[in-house]
Amino acid sequence: MPAVYINRVATAVPPYDVHDAFRRFAQSTLHLANPRQARLFERMADKSGIEHRFSCLTPSNRPEGDHFDAGGFYARSDFPDTATRMEQYERHAPELAQAAVERLHLGADRDRITHLIVTSCTGFSAPGLDLDLIARCELPTTVERTVIGFMGCYAAINALKLAYHIVRSEASARVLLVNLELCTLHLKENADLEQMLSFLLFADGCAASLVSAEPSGIALDSFRAVLVPDTRDLITWNIRDAGFDMVLSGRVPAVIQDGLRRSADEILAGAPAASIDLWAVHPGGRTVLDAVERAFALAPTALATSRDVLRRYGNMSSATVMFVIERLMRSGARGRSGCAMSFGPGLIAETMLFRTAA
């Protein structure tokens, strides 16, 4: 069977940096209900490790006022229903996905794409984003399409796993992966501090990648899934009348740390963590990265790329780990071993061992 490679990755974000505006909107909302929680929110914001996040929504000049955004999508005390949120997804998702694919500069490879895999947990429609991309990017109409929906942050690793098996079974396959998330469409107005932390963390973004047997980029070696028992309620993502409801327990970092520590030999195929040169860890938040660092006893610099992506973009769900992989590939390291991982509902860690092409 052929070796399988991520040949290249490209990324795109919307034009609006909303981190400061979301922070001000959430802080003012909490202050009205509970000034003490508002002060705690500010301290947590200062320690989040995030400086920028991007959204398809245009922020208003005064997010402390009646509307967060210029279009009135988030009006104080009148947040949108699910149908309105999905209308915005249908409007903005195809354009952002196309931008990421175009940055791959496929050229002649465009006509050679055999498979298309799309991941998203932030919106749905039919005909969907897969067919939008075929039309917008002029892909072959015969392309085989798969949509991996509603898996959350670890969907990109599952998409890579699927592409890996496709190429191993069809050596001539050329698989286009698109990870598109518009997380900022699903914020909730709530006086609960834990719920309002989503205003500090989530963002919009898209990654596109090409996977094939061509020996360039990074080689995909193996995959492991680690399910932590009795953690089903710690991360949940449910469709409700007023949008998609997120539960993200404060226990998640500690559970991730314990689960990774117990499963380290399985994840790393018996290799010591010190032998892994490159770490592509989904930056689900600063405390999540801290938990991974402690679980594998990593050097403080080991997760520098993940921390930089968190600082520049926040958590873009399934797209985020691909932003990390793109930056590691761009660094030009060759012949080095790596480990990628993402976390999500279950609680599950989806992991992948890779190596840079010689």
Placement of each model-derived feature along the sequence:
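Glycine/charged-rich beta-loop-alpha catalytic/anionic-binding loops adjacent to active sites
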Residues: 80, 111-115, 137-149, 189-194, ...
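A short glycine/serine-rich beta->alpha loop
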Residues: 83-88, 118, 145-149, 194-196, ...
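Hydrophobic alpha-helical hairpins/lids featuring a short glycine-rich hinge
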Residues: 77-124
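Phosphate/pyrophosphate-binding loops at sites that engage ATP/ADP/AMP, CoA/4′-phosphopantetheine
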Residues: 100-113, 262-277, 328-332
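Acidic-glycine-rich active-site phosphate/pyrophosphate-binding loop
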Residues: 124-139, 177-188, 232-237, 289-303
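Short coil/turn connectors at secondary-structure junctions
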Residues: 1-3, 110-114, 141-144, 170-175, ...
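Condensing-enzyme catalytic core mediating Claisen C-C bond formation in acyl metabolism
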Residues: 1-88, 174, 183, 187-258, ...
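Claisen-condensing/thiolase-fold acyl-transfer catalytic domains that form or cleave C-C bonds
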Residues: 121-122, 140-142, 147-168, 257, ...
